[in-house]
């Protein structure tokens, strides 16, 4: 209440959702209505909080502009709105932890188990999300977790794990290792083409699960994509 630019008095904050990276709380007003979502950012994973929040600010502003250009209605339910601190920063640091606040999207829900119909809606929504971000210039966003989606780097880690055999179960998974090796060259095509200057880095969500989006409680149509740990990665 004292640190962020909130428009309503809040009286309680309770755990919300089942995320396993950040700690998320739903924040209610005096009428018992959920108005905000407060998160403690896991800075052990996202070590550059400045970059993380700057990425999110760029992405949400870009999407909001695209929606406005399309003449969309109810835009505040179709893109996350993060609130600045009272000194206009994108997050608050209390000396130990990093915090951010966004508006709660009313009449929304998420799903852990999905039907083919929900999966179809989710696929369309992620496609729209990627399309809206396609014209963000390369170099605009920072890489929040370096090499997280770099398959060449991941294969190096894989080969080290095979060599070290720390768990002593190499003989039990030889068929799986062979399967990965068969696919290794194809897995690294994007990184190779990027190095050769044949493929640009573009903006990907990089965690396109159905439970990373909000659905309208009445129509089951997707409202917006969440968990914007967006970083650039090579793709065509």
Protein language model features and the residues they cover:
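Hydrophobic HxD+1 residue recognition
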Residues: 208
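Conserved N-terminal boundary motif of the eukaryotic protein kinase catalytic domain
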Residues: 9-13
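Conserved small/polar residues in nucleotide/adenosyl-binding loops
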Residues: 229-236
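Protein kinase glycine-rich loop
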Residues: 15-18
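Juxta-kinase regulatory segment immediately upstream of eukaryotic protein kinase catalytic domains
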Residues: 1-8
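ATP-dependent phospho-/nucleotidyl transfer catalytic cores
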Residues: 40, 47-50, 105-122, 135-205, ...
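Conserved ATP-binding subdomain of kinase catalytic cores across diverse folds
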Residues: 20-23, 28, 35, 41-153
């Amino acid at each position: 209440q004292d640190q962020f630019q909130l428009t309503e008095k809040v009286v309680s904050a309770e755990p919300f959702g089942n995320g396993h990276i950040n700690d998320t709380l739903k924040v209610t007003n005096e009428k018992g209505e959920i108005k905000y979502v407060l998160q403690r950012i896991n800075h052990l994973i996202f070590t550059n909080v400045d970059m993380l929040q700057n990425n999110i600010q760029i992405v949400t502003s870009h999407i909001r502009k695209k929606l406005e250009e399309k003449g969309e209605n109810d835009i505040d339910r179709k893109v996350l709105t993060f609130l600045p601190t009272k000194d206009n920063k994108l997050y608050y640091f209390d000396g130990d932890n990093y915090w951010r606040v966004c508006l709660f999207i009313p009449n929304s829900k998420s799903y852990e188990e999905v039907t083919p119909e929900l999966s179809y809606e989710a696929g369309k929504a992620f496609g729209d999300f990627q399309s809206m971000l396609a014209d963000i210039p390369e170099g605009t966003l920072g890489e929040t977790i370096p090499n997280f989606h770099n398959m060449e780097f991941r294969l190096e880690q894989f080969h080290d794990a095979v060599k070290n055999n720390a768990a002593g179960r190499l003989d039990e998974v030889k068929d799986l290792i062979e399967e990965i090796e068969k696919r290794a060259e194809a897995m690294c095509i994007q990184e190779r083409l990027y190095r050769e200057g044949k493929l640009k880095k573009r903006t990907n969500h990089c965690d396109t699960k159905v439970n990373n989006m909000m659905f309208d409680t009445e129509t089951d149509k997707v409202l917006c994509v969440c968990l914007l740990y967006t970083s650039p990665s090579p793709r065509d």
